[in-house]
Amino acid sequence: TLRLLARGDTVVGIDNHNNYYDPAIKEARLDRFIGHPSYKHLRVDLADREAIEEAFSTHRPKRVVNLAAQAGVRYSIENPLAYINSNIVGFAHILEGCRHNGIEHLVYASSSSVYGANTKTPFSVHQNVDHPLSTYAASKKSNELMAHAYSNIYGLPTTGLRFFTVYGPWGRPDMALFLFTKAILANEPIKVFNYGKHRRDFTYIDDIVEGIIRTLDNPATPNLKWNSDQPDSATSNVPWRVYNIGNNQPVELMDYIAALEKALGKQAAKELLPLQTGDVPETYADVDDLVEQFDYKPNTSVEDGISHFVSWYRDYFKV
């Protein structure tokens, strides 16, 4: 939102401000631009069809970025229906709003979790992704399929972005970096799953934003070379595309923790635990398509990204 406002765009933001995590951080995040003359905020739920219809018909956006979702692989195991209502029903309402209002381009957040049971790395958008390991992953794969149907039937240009382990200032408090930082500063042990042998393609928030902006400004187009006898999973003969946005440099969890310890100036007490149900041992993004088509590749190092996060955390929480 800040990037779009800074370049002169008018933005309408939608958030239901639920209590999946502390709403106070959501309000503080919003306070940074709520007073901007080119920003309008709507406190509605994507699952509220009438409210979304009204938002589209009243504000008539030209382009749509849908980053709203019920997030979290682990919570999806406990409460799968929350993911159906938000991520599938809510996304259907976004698609309908786009269809009926002549939207130029819909960009939406998919996830690296769609790679599920795949083990060949780096994960490529040209791989088959039909074996999700969680309801969250299945909901994100569903978004890609729903978008394709709308691109095919209604000619709606859609672009899905598979984000890889996003971190940085103003992130969700249920994410590992947030939990680790809070625990270390409180002299409490951190829970390290898979005995710290996880490898993640940690991607800094500013790099994610840059990827969103670049794809948003280039509406999806049909792949004129698409072959239905050998269908490419990343493109289509309709205006539909998917891309990975990841750092293309997986980091072992123990090294990630070491970078956090350095930034905090404190050592962590570690509680080593087995791999959790629904989790995957490694993520690693192939970003060749992103580089080729948008001349862009995320490049913020984990050390720099964590340092920025710790500076923000200390300032926000006054610790």
Residue ranges and their predicted role:
Residues 1-166, 216, 296, 308, ...:
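N-terminal Rossmann-like NAD(P)+-binding domain of SDR-like oxidoreductases, especially those catalyzing
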Residues 3, 184-319:
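C-terminal substrate-binding subdomain of Rossmann-fold SDR/epimerase-dehydratase oxidoreductases
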Residues 92, 96, 145-148, 181-182, ...:
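A cross-family signal for key residues in well-ordered alpha-helices
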Residues 142, 146, 150, 180, ...:
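Hydrophobic alpha-helix immediately C-terminal to the catalytic Tyr-X-X-X-Lys motif of short-chain
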Residues 170:
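Conserved GTPase G-domain signal focused on the G5
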